[in-house]
Amino acid sequence: VGERVIAGTKTPQDSMVRMMKGPKGTKVKLLINRSGTDIPFDITRDKIPVHCIDAAFMVNDTTGYIKLSKFTRTTYKEFKEATSRLLDAGMKRLVFDLRDNSGGYFDQALMLSNEFLQNKDGIVYMEGLHRPRQNYDADGRGSLKDIQISVLIDEGTASSSEIFAGAIQDNDRGVIVGRRSFGKGLVQEPINFTDGSGVRVTVARFYTPSGRCIQKPYDKNNYQYDIYERYAHGEMTSADSMKVDTTALFYTVKGRRVYGGGGIIPDIFVPIDTTLATKFYINCNKKAVQMRFAASMFDRYRGVLSTIEDFSSLDRWMSSIDMEAHFLEYAARTENLRPAPGEWEKTVSYMMPQIKALVGRYSKLD
């Protein structure tokens, strides 16, 4: 980095990051070792946009799909741009994927919820021991009130994502599909001290419009082990094993029963699929073979990938080059990893969409 050699010096990652950062418009010299070859780079420092929408495309003629990874300050803007493109393409239904979305900006969750709800529909409210109830309702000016919506959630869906899912469910606006969400619904306020430090104090909790508390309980000191215990108790694979607090019974706008006790319980349960995680898949994950393969494909097909601008073209190109054969050859050559008889047939439908997605991120496709 610059004139300093850091390879082999055990330089901490945060120190390397500080060395590479600097005023916008200035340059930093890097020497990168790629596949055994040292390659020099002169990089101009600038703001790097981090997008929150991982994917937005039409599944068929009338169904759109959007994957939202986090709620950032630009989420609403990105979401509006994505839905505008999908509406122009004929979208009548939307699959909104909030799996593993840990939340983020509260106001963005409110604005996204508002897009789907009628005037005065409840979105969420907050209330605490020393904090009076504060309601947040829709204003009816959303542009997606007539779009059918299905929301995908899982145990990694938390905070702002749960606010959105709870609002959709309690207003009977759409269908929630997946597994019980994380259960993170605390309202915290920062208190700053004169020495520059600070502390965040919990002052209230978030509740869905029907009155369900999103925050899961802290009982038995098992808060940090909750997800592990869900696996152990079979909740991830069987709806019958899902813990439901039957005493915390609430009703949606149309009178459907919903239960509190922490997190959002889906309308349609989808078990986690463990049958496709073969030993070959697990070993590839441990060594990040999929990510390194994607980078190698970019190096090899940089010219082609840089011209692909739509999903159909990307899919046709991937089919034409036999991506499966390329990946299996790469795994065997670089890590001596080969699927046992029958393993690839089991795991191919699990691995290849991930691999194609990683390669596709190097294209010009939004």
Regions found by a protein language model. Give the residues of each.
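A generic structural motif
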Residues: 31-35, 207, 251
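Glycine-rich active-site/cofactor-binding loop and its immediate structural neighborhood
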Residues: 1
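Cleft-lining beta-strand/loop regions that shape enzyme active-site pockets
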Residues: 4-195
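Polar, glycine-rich mid-to-C-terminal structural blocks
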Residues: 160, 172, 177-179, 183-249
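Conserved functional hotspot residues or short segments at active or partner-binding sites
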Residues: 213-214, 218-366
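A sequence-level detector of short linear motifs
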Residues: 7, 40, 200, 215, ...
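Short clusters of small/polar residues that mark proteolytic maturation junctions
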Residues: 10, 43, 128, 203, ...
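Short, solvent-exposed loop/turn elements at domain surfaces
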Residues: 50-52, 73-77, 209-210, 258-260, ...
